[in-house]
Amino acid sequence: GGGLGGSGTFTTGALSTNILSGGGWKYLYDTVTLTNNGAMVLNGATGIYAYNAGAKTINNTGTWDIQTDADTTYYLGTLTINNSGSLTKSAGTLVSILNGLNNSGTVSVTSGTLQLDTDGGTGSHTHSGAFNVGTGATLDFNSGTHTLDAASSLTGLGTTQFSGATMAVNTAAIPQLTITAGTAAINSA
């Protein structure tokens, strides 16, 4: 456990390796920004928790490996995750919830389910990057509004699921698509 707070930015270097582990939540407070330029690993029983009022931001330009079923979520305020690097859920067989993701890099799901939610289900997120879902894994767009623009791609033999989000899909084919709830406007590029 532990936390970062205040109104500044905590930046990790390109050659750094940052392991967020242990049994306690990893808290973000106030309006803090965490910028990862190196390698960040999230493992352990609990995830990242954006707590109290204010807008919290995680910018990932490096690699972020989620090796747990724990969530990256919020309570009060907002949480935005901007991924222009590589974000992977590589371990765990259950669901990891990721709130507030905008992807212009690469998101890979190789184990379990990565569920994309938004703050209170009302946020709007644009994706111009790649999503790759491995065999037996699931990428679940669960809430809020997600726009997959023409530059984005969804690949892999795993399942892509729309389970409650409002989707605007402007990309090529989506392999293994399951729609269980929500709204989807599909305008294949």
Model-derived features: positions:
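Extracellular beta-strand-rich, repetitive "passenger/adhesive" scaffolds
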Residues: 1-189
